[in-house]
């Protein structure tokens, strides 16, 4: 169940994020670095590394809510705070992809034998 951090950022649990993604209600933005994203990612997540992040470059009036994710929740919270500083709604996924995997949710990895992406359980 979602909750709000002390600085008013909405925080979703991984299972909620998975459901909202499946329903097309959110845009999941992964703020990890490209090498982290290449190693494993959540299906449907878009990459926008925090190291080059500019919250003003994200859509402000799209039909889907933007939810940020990272490895453990710190960088995604930073991105959400930056977006909120612009007066835009923002949310992040608690625990990042680490928590996502701990809950057994699937990630996409590259099969080293074929070079193709494969979805595997977390």
Kindly label every feature range from the protein language model.
Residues 1-27, 34-65, 74-122:
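Rhodanese-like catalytic fold shared by cysteine-dependent sulfurtransferases
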Residues 69:
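Short, surface-exposed ligand- or partner-binding patches at beta-edge/loop junctions that are enriched
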């Amino acid at each position: 169940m979602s909750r709000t951090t002390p600085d008013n950022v909405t925080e979703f649990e991984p299972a909620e994020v998975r459901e909202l993604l499946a329903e097309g209600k959110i845009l999941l933005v992964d703020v990890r670095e490209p090498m982290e994203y290449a190693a494993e990612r959540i299906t449907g997540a878009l990459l926008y590394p925090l190291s080059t992040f500019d919250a003003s470059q994200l859509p402000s009036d799209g039909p889907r809510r933007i939810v940020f994710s990272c490895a453990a929740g710190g960088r995604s919270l930073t991105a959400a705070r930056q977006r909120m500083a612009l007066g835009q709604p923002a949310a992040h996924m608690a625990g990042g992809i680490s928590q996502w995997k701990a809950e057994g949710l699937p990630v996409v990895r590259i099969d080293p034998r074929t070079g193709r992406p494969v979805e595997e359980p977390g």
